[in-house]
A protein has these predicted regions:
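N-terminal "domain-start" segment that seeds a small globular fold
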Residues: 19-49
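Structural microenvironment flanking redox-active thiols in thiol-disulfide oxidoreductases
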Residues: 70-110, 121-127
Length: 186
């Protein structure tokens, strides 16, 4: 019985640590180069971050099994809507092994419509970016450099997030001005 309880507790602790549910702020510094990231669109065609050069990118790493990710998705969708028609892309990169049908079912359930959805079934992006929990969202400038990172849930439909994206849009050549602070929260 004790072994069973220890196994159960260990499994729960592991699962809790795999999704970053705590609210945390982020401070950004000078933009830094991103590692090469390759991923698949929903049709299975490979692409990478170079396809989005010239655009501000909000890159959200998530998984279908991550409850905080599910909670955050609608705000990301509203962020995408707020910048529709501007050179801003909100990319939702699923880093679990779920097939495209399950990823799409998850998105349908959450009710998102404006996110550019991609898959990384081998979770290579999490290793390349040294991600330790989900969700994680990167702000990427027009030159393809990481200009900010939020670990955990953020209010992507709030003024602080809008201001960060507007600042990246206004920066000459996509940077290198630092963004300051983005408060995260649900």
């Amino acid at each position: 019985m004790r072994t069973l309880l220890l196994l159960l507790f260990g499994s729960l602790a592991l699962a809790a640590g795999s999704c970053a549910a705590a609210e945390a702020p982020i401070a950004t510094a000078e933009p830094k180069p991103l590692p090469e990231l390759r991923f698949l669109d929903m049709a299975g065609v490979e692409t990478g971050m170079e396809a989005f050069r010239g655009e501000v990118v909000v890159l959200n790493l998530w998984a279908t099994w991550c409850a905080p990710c599910k909670e955050e998705m609608p705000a990301l969708d509203r962020l995408a809507a707020a910048f529709e028609g501007r050179p801003v892309r909100v990319l939702a990169l699923s880093v679990d092994r779920a097939p495209p049908e399950r990823v799409q079912a998850f998105l349908d359930e959450v009710g998102v419509e404006r996110l550019a959805v991609y898959r990384d079934p081998k979770a290579a992006a999490t290793r390349a970016l040294k991600v330790q929990g989900l969700p994680v969202t990167l702000l990427v400038d027009r030159e393809g450099r990481e200009a900010g990172r939020v670990v955990g849930i953020a209010r992507w439909d709030g003024e602080e997030a809008f201001a960060a994206v507007r600042e990246l849009l206004a920066a000459p050549g996509g940077g290198p001005r630092p963004l300051g602070m983005i408060q995260t929260g649900s």
